[in-house]
């Protein structure tokens, strides 16, 4: 093959001359652009490029071995510790030339070892022969000297000398034999050591592609690096075997893959065998008893608190968490291992699995605090607590205003009561405490609280209006609280007043007047003119005497929260109705989730008071937060314990709420599948008092439908803050303020984010506007409206449109491009579109009643005489929330 130049070779390889020259230089051949290249040089270049482009020369393996170590802890619980052992090993792949070189070196090393072995053997033999000669010469010298020494002795000693000579010759021969055996043994050990070292080095450097998998390869993933891992395992075993303290250390060590399969007793016995190998004594088999699986289930006493997670319940029963989850699924409840479940569910699961359940009460601290109270002994008569209930605008507040001789109703927004007002009134016959409840439908929970805190219910019914829905609800609340009812028939001075109608309607709900044999007193009053007010007060006091109301006046007070709100200057304020004892300024009170010291007390007139007895409503300041309306108020001795109880109640409420929320059932799963199609109206609600927040939230949530849901993102008492505005911006919510306003920082966020902020003072307007917002999210309803009928009189053929129906418009108007139906014998046979509409060969847009026209139906030619063409249009009707 002729030589070619660098330029020609570069053109053949389709590369640049500079790149080819560089490649030759990398291969160790210096060339210029005009030099020629021989076939040998080309082959050298090709070998160099193949070696350069071959696969990676190094392979790095990283192995992680994970295991779990169970450490026993206190209380029968065990702690699991995850152990991870990481190993990293690098294998170098030799190229073929390197492999040949290593093979040649290996062969040379073997020959050198053989020659060294032979030389060592010959050297040992020479040394043994020389040693024997030296010993024989020394022996001969000693014999000669001995012979010269004893030459003058007597002849009778000759025999002993000869015997001694024979003995020493025999010893010399024995010594020579031992020296030869020692030399041979050393030679064999040296040869065996050299051969073992050579075999180990050869195995470390070999790269086998067709190695058989070892027994423990099933414990690892089969990958391309399987053989390398086997080599690593073999090397690890050799290293660890060298560290064993006895000959049986390697045999006694368990295999890698089966380290969890052997029992603890087997491992102890193996370790004992290793320890006993050094001293020549082997310890007997371990006397420790191995764990045997129990033949039957162990029934345990399981102590369950008010809430517990599934994992904790499994630990108490000494079973796996998956078994508890399976048992819960059999009972119809789905749970995860970290989910909090309530006490009843945990009891059912534990009893289902055959364990005995011990229910633990966690409110011992609370009971101890409540029992450590000085409540006094003697009970004294107290004033009745009267709640005025009734329908909206039936005159409840006006009636109470006349009694108090004030004008409170005009101060309420919209003239309706939106808070519970608590007042006490001194009369000639004694004191009466009045609670004025809202009558609007949204304030159901407020009325229920009023009924529970009261002794007597005054049911106000307008004589001209009769029994209304909230009147019925007030009757139900009174019956549920088992409170006597005094009926005040108001607006008796109106011409259209009909008291007998009121009696008849109330009798249907179990409220019978005394003259009809019932237990309820009926009093005719007029809040405007003041008619019958004294009779009403007398009836209330008479009913109170019948009830014999008594309370302990001395001692630590207890009562109920009627209303609560957050005042910007004073902080959390709670309206408290004292039931028993006397509440003093400076007392430590526990109120639901809140606690604190009474910093100040005010009566309903805003005057500072130092104490309040039974049936007296007061406003207290100094609580840690705004309590929920309806919470129990209790005076305790120790503020530290009160704080602990309040924090315990908060945690308990949070756990119970979480357990209730996470309790997922099968039927809810299918309901959640279609939630993506539901529109949501997000609202951030702030109001002036806690009762209004509760009432508005309940009312708005009741507006939710299947298509639009109302979601209260956040709610609270007090003004609208920057946090509320940020929350509304993040959740795309409407900011609603009920009798509150936004501060300066909140207004900046609202303007920057263009949030929808709305202020309300009347609950009617708030609910109506939320309804309007929800209505805008409803998809419109599509309705078909017939606009005209045309009767087919004759059918013509048209080359452009096909069958043309000659029609007479009998009703309405026929318009072009409107959808139509073709009716035959009042049965719809086709539904399509009107394509052509002509009158006297002129295209028209519409034909009115009584006119003739030609109609071409799009993609339909089976029009017959006598058919009726019905023209309609589709209109969208906006739906509203009822």
UniProtKB/Swiss-Prot annotation:
Residue numbers spanned by region Disordered: 28-296
Keyword annotations: Acetylation, Cytoplasm, GTP-binding, Initiation factor, Nucleotide-binding, Protein biosynthesis
Region (G4): 490-493
Region named G5: 526-528
Positions of the UniProt region annotated as G3: 436-439
UniProt-listed Pfam families: EF-G_D2 (PF22042), GTP_EFTU (PF00009), GTP_EFTU_D2 (PF03144), IF-2 (PF11987), IF2_assoc (PF08364), IF2_N (PF04760)
In-chain residues carrying the UniProt-annotated modification N6-acetyllysine: 800
Gene Ontology molecular function, alphabetical: GTP binding; GTPase activity; guanosine tetraphosphate binding; translation initiation factor activity
Cellular localization per UniProt: Cytoplasm
UniProt-annotated stretches for the region G2: 415-419
Top-level taxon of origin: Bacteria
Family according to the record: Belongs to the TRAFAC class translation factor GTPase superfamily. Classic translation factor GTPase family. IF-2 subfamily.
HAMAP family: IF_2_B
Protein name as it appears in the record: Translation initiation factor IF-2
């Amino acid at each position: 093959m002729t030589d070619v130049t660098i330029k020609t070779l570069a053109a053949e390889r389709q590369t640049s001359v500079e790149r080819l020259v560089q490649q030759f230089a990398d291969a160790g051949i210096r060339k210029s652009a005009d030099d020629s290249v021989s076939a040998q040089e080309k082959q050298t270049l090709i070998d160099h490029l193949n070696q350069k482009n071959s696969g990676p020369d190094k392979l790095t393996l990283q192995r992680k071995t994970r295991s779990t170590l169970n450490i026993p802890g206190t209380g029968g619980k065990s702690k699991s510790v995850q152990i991870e052992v990481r190993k990293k090993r690098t294998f170098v792949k030799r190229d073929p030339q390197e492999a040949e070189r290593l093979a040649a070196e290996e062969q040379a090393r073997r020959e050198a070892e053989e020659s060294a072995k032979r030389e060592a053997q010959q050297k040992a033999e020479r040394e043994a022969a020389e040693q024997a000669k030296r010993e024989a010469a020394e022996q001969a010298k000693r014999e000669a000297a001995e012979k010269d020494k004893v030459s003058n002795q007597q002849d009778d000693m000759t025999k002993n000398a000869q015997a001694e000579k024979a003995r020493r010759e025999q010893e010399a021969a024995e010594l020579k034999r031992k020296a030869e055996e020692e030399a041979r043994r050393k030679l064999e050990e040296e040869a065996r050591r050299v051969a073992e070292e050579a075999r180990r080095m050869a195995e470390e450097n070999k790269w086998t592609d067709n190695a058989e998998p070892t027994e423990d390869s099933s414990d690892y993933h089969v990958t391309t690096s399987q053989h390398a891992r086997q080599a690593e395992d073999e090397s690890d075993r050799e290293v660890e075997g060298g560290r064993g303290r006895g000959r049986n250390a390697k045999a006694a060590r368990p295999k890698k893959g089966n380290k969890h399969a052997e029992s603890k007793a087997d491992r102890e016995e193996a370790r004992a065998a290793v320890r006993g190998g050094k001293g020549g004594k082997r310890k007997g088999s371990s006397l420790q008893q191995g764990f045997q699986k129990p033949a039957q289930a162990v029934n345990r006493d399981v102590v369950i608190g008010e809430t517990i997670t599934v994992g904790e319940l499994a630990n108490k029963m000494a079973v796996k968490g998956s078994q508890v989850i399976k048992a819960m699924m059999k009972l119809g409840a789905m749970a995860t291992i970290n989910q909090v479940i309530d006490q009843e569910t945990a009891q059912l699961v534990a009893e289902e699995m055959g364990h005995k359940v011990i229910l633990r009460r966690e409110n011992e601290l609370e009971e101890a605090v409540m029992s450590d109270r000085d409540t006094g002994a003697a009970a004294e008569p107290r004033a009745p607590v009267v709640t005025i209930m009734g329908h909206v605008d039936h005159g409840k507040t006006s009636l109470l205003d006349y009694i108090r001789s004030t004008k409170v109703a005009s101060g309420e927004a919209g003239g309706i009561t939106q808070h519970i007002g608590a007042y006490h009134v001194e009369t000639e016959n004694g004191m009466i405490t009045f609670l004025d409840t809202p009558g609007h439908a949204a304030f159901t929970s407020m009325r229920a609280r009023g009924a529970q805190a009261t002794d007597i219910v005054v049911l106000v019914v307008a004589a001209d209006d009769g029994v209304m829905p909230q009147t019925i609800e007030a009757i139900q609340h009174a019956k549920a609280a088992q409170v006597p009812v005094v009926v005040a028939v108001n607006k008796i001075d109106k011409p259209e007043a009909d008291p007998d109608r009121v009696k008849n309607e109330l009798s249907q709900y179990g409220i019978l007047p005394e003259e009809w044999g019932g237990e309820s007193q009926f009093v005719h009053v007029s809040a405007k003119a003041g008619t019958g007010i004294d009779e009403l007060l007398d009836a209330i006091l008479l009913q109170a005497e019948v009830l014999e109301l008594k309370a302990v006046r001395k001692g630590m007070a207890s009562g109920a929260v009627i209303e609560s709100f957050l005042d910007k200057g004073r902080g959390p304020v709670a309206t408290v109705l004292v039931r028993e004892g006397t509440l003093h300024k400076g007392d430590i009170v526990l109120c639901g989730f809140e606690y604190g010291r009474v910093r100040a007390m005010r009566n309903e007139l805003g005057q500072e008071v130092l104490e309040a007895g039974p049936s007296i409503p007061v406003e207290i300041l100094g609580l840690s937060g705004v309590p929920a309306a309806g919470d129990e108020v209790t005076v305790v001795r120790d503020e530290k314990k009160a704080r602990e109880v309040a924090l315990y109640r908060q945690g308990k409420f949070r756990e119970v709420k979480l357990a209730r929320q996470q309790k997922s059932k099968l039927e809810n799963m299918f309901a959640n599948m279609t939630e993506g199609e539901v529109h949501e109206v997000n609202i951030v609600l702030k109001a002036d008092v806690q009762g209004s927040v509760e009432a508005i939230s309940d009312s708005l949530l009741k507006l939710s439908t299947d298509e639009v849901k109302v979601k209260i993102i956040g709610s609270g008492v007090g003004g609208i803050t920057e946090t509320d505005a940020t929350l509304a911006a993040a959740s795309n919510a409407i900011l609603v303020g009920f009798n509150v306003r936004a501060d300066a920082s909140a207004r900046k966020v609202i303007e920057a984010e263009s949030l929808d902020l709305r202020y309300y003072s009347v609950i009617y307007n708030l609910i109506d506007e939320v309804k309007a917002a929800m209505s805008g999210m409803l998809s419109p309803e599509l309705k078909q409206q017939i606009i005209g009928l045309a009767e087919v009189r004759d059918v013509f053929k048209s080359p452009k449109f096909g069958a043309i129906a000659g029609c007479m418009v009998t009703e309405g108007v026929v318009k072009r491009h409107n959808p139509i139906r073709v009716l035959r014998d009042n049965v719809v046979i086709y539904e399509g579109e009107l394509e052509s509409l002509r009158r006297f060969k002129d295209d028209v847009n519409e034909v009115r009643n009584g006119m003739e026209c030609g109609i071409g139906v799009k993609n339909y030619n089976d029009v017959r005489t006598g058919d009726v063409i019905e023209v309609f249009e589709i209109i969208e009707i906006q739906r509203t929330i009822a």
